Amino acid sequence: MLYKYLFIYIVTKISLSSSLYHNFCTINNTNGSNFNVFDTNNGRFLNKNNRIRNILNKNINKKSSFSFINGNSLKNFKNDHKYHDFTKFTKIPEFLEEDNEPIVSELIRNFCIIAHVDHGKSTLADRFLEFTKSVPPERLKEQYLDNMELERERGITIKLQSARIKYNSILDGKTYTLNLIDTPGHIDFNHEARRSISACEGAILVVDGTKGIEAQTVTTANIAIEKGLKIIPVVNKIDLEHCDFKSTAESLKKFFGFKESDILKASAKKGIGIEDILEAVVVSIPPPKVDLEKPFRALVFDSFYDPYRGAICYIRVCCVFRLYFQVFEGSTKIGDEITLMNADITSKVTGLGIMLPEMKQTHSLQLVNSSGQVGWITAGIKKTNEIHVGDTISLKSYVKKNLVEPINKFENSKPTVFAGIYPCIGGDFDKLQTALEKLKLNDHSFQFERSDSSMVGMGFKCGFNGLLHLDITVERLEREFDTQVIVTSPSVPYRCTLRDKSVVTVDDASKWPDESQIKSSEEPWTDVTLRVPEEYFLSFINIILSSVGSVMSMLSKMRGRFKEKNKVKDTNMVVMNYDLPLSEILSDFFNKLKSVTNGYGSYDYEGTFYEPIELCKLKILLNGTEAKGLAVVTPRNRAYDRGKLIVETLVNLIPSRQFKVPVQAVIGKRVISSSNIPAVKKNVIEKCSGGDPSRKKKLLENQARVLLVLINDVIGKETNGSGRMCNNPF
């Protein structure tokens, strides 16, 4: 009894307020029977002696949400203070009121929105939610589906988001269930768009009427067409005076073969044409092909980590995972034992539901009454690396009997940019590792492995899909996980053929083979599509010629290969194709493109192939000692320019010491660039105005001994203390 009342006192002092609904947690005895129920809204216990059934019926009408703490007696709560932290309770998703209503598969439409950055994709999603009254007007805000603070600050969509909306068609009067997936538009997050496309039967292609079709939009739309999705073209921003609907429509017809009657007009900002788009979704996009008689199968297309709900509901489990998935066949319910087929992991369903767009649980414990739905599921899985996007979920009994086959829907994304991420404080290595594991659960294109550096200690070598992906990842580490990190300069994977005929891929300069062992080397190239206004074409050609080489200088510099140029009919846009080294895209190529075209130019790149080039390892020496973390791999014919840039940057970056510090760029044993950090000298014999010269000699010898100690401290602190280095010019 003492334990019981002690626990009641603790939780009632920290009761949470909620004007919307009640939250309850059920405490179980060691024998598994319900001990009592605690109402986190009112801070009171409701046990069987307190007429729990009547109170539940009266207060929450059987619609409230429950969280379970299994197999723990009150003695456990008393002895472990972490169970007393009820300040971290979060609102558990409410049960869905319409859960018992049957949903016919023929009335389901799964679709995504494809658009370039700033073409009005998120605004259009807002209008869908507003028009269908899926979100109350007082709660609706701009970029409603963009949950990250970073997304709102930068005005871009980083993570795909799903929402289920109900729409009453004016054509047949039927109520349709529309599963909307809002997708990112930037090329660095193209993997998110690919996952969205794989979970849909149709897509809305949104094009800004003031800018026309962008290169990245063409790439993503072609992926959707290859997957067999029905495309609905929409020209947005028709309310603006400089919107050129005619030329944009002509471009859509040229690139994708649309009929003019298929192209819709809209203004997401003003709410024009929203109903026409929704009707087109209902009429044009086919329902999912399903069979309820077949065994349950679902495709995992996203997941994320929920630390607070894990602390409440799954005390014996390290964390809680929520998986977003699409049901292809059959159905499931809470309590079922499911298996992740590719990972071969079995767990019990502890929660499931849909997005409206907030998470809602299903009251009848039935996830869907028809296949083809998009929803979420929770299961007690102990390790973050056990969740894989593209995995197939099925019931354990079906998997054991080999009644189901995995759904092969995703291709693994290969990183194109590599950088090292290290904790600013050496003791934060475990914290950083945990943060990266949780981040990977929500960003499946992000890859990392452990790496040790003599300069910055233990850390991780990470792979990204581009520089923006790298920048966003570092921002998320700092904001979401409170982890301060050092980021080394981005690099690309090079390939070396050794004299023993073995081939190695090197994405870190510290792993570069000895020069005597290398027979030949190659660097990655990529196929780049550029779209620029015709009036900027000559200026753009000058950029290509000056920064990445022309066809005539290709043999000597191995930079830039022009392939073809096409004029888009009835527009002032020029589309060009180039082969460019991937390392050039990592530099300031994009900034130069935007600068010379006044922001109208765009580019996209896909695929990688290797071209032979003579590469070398450029080492940096500080006071005669190699700074391994500053070494880079570079084309030999550009080594001098890059070495000079690094040396000049370090001379300006490292503060002066009491002695001169030479900074050198070295290839093998040959110094190709050198400079000195001037000394800040202290005149130790200034106080000796005269007298015995041995006194001055002694002071100078003492100073020399101190300098020897300080000299050994040149490497590391000053170069490492600069923090995030991803924007360094070298």
Curated annotation (Swiss-Prot):
Catalytic activity, as annotated: GTP + H2O = GDP + phosphate + H(+)
Which residues participate in GTP binding?
115-122, 182-186, 236-239
Q: Which UniProt keywords apply?
A: GTP-binding, Hydrolase, Membrane, Mitochondrion, Mitochondrion inner membrane, Nucleotide-binding, Protein biosynthesis
Specify the enzyme's EC class, one word: hydrolase
What does the record give as EC number?
3.6.5.-
Q: Where in the cell is it found?
A: Mitochondrion inner membrane
Describe its membrane topology.
Peripheral membrane protein
A Pfam family reported for this protein in Swiss-Prot or TrEMBL: EFG_C
Q: Membrane among the record's keywords? A: yes
GO CC terms in record: mitochondrial inner membrane; mitochondrial matrix
HAMAP family listed in its UniProt record: LepA
Q: What is this protein called?
A: Translation factor GUF1 homolog, mitochondrial
